[in-house]
Amino acid sequence: MKKDTTPKFHKLHVKTGDTVQIIAGKDKGKVGEVIKALPQLSKVVVKGVNIKTKQIIAGKDKGKVGEVIKALPQLSKVVVKGVNIKTKHVKPQQEGESGRIVTQEAPIHSSNVMLYSTKQNVASRVCYTFTAEGKKVRKLKKTGEILDN
């Protein structure tokens, strides 16, 4: 039997620009901003520390908090600012030009990040509620803080 290679789309609980905390992996405990979300891979790319809010819950960056820079819902991944940094060796493009080493944020699976409240410095799960006007918004379960304006 062949494996099903079609990508599975997962609903991500984080969006680009959210602040998250890493809850697993080598960056556990870091806080950063989500740069990019990869829903197909169920991963996120996180950037920076103590900027917005998402907490990483697994992996080498476990515990780090950062802002979600990019959400990739087709891959179920996100990119968080300053978290899961990888080095890439780039060959020279032209003769006489030297090669270089570039550092960039790699995607993290969305299940390894939690939304983070910068006001109360606590990571929390998300629930959905409706405002008085009938608009559906995201809310942190622990703090009751509304995320979407």
Curated annotation (Swiss-Prot):
InterPro entries: KOW (IPR005824), Rib_uL2_dom2 (IPR014722), Ribosomal_uL24 (IPR003256), Ribosomal_uL24_CS (IPR005825), Ribosomal_uL24_KOW (IPR041988), Translation_prot_SH3-like_sf (IPR008991). Pfam families: KOW, ribosomal_L24. This is Large ribosomal subunit protein uL24. CDD domains: KOW_RPL26. The keyword Transport does not apply. Keywords: Ribonucleoprotein, Ribosomal protein, RNA-binding, rRNA-binding. It comes from Nostoc sp. (strain PCC 7120 / SAG 25.82 / UTEX 2576). It comes from the Bacteria. One of its GO terms (cellular component) is ribonucleoprotein complex.
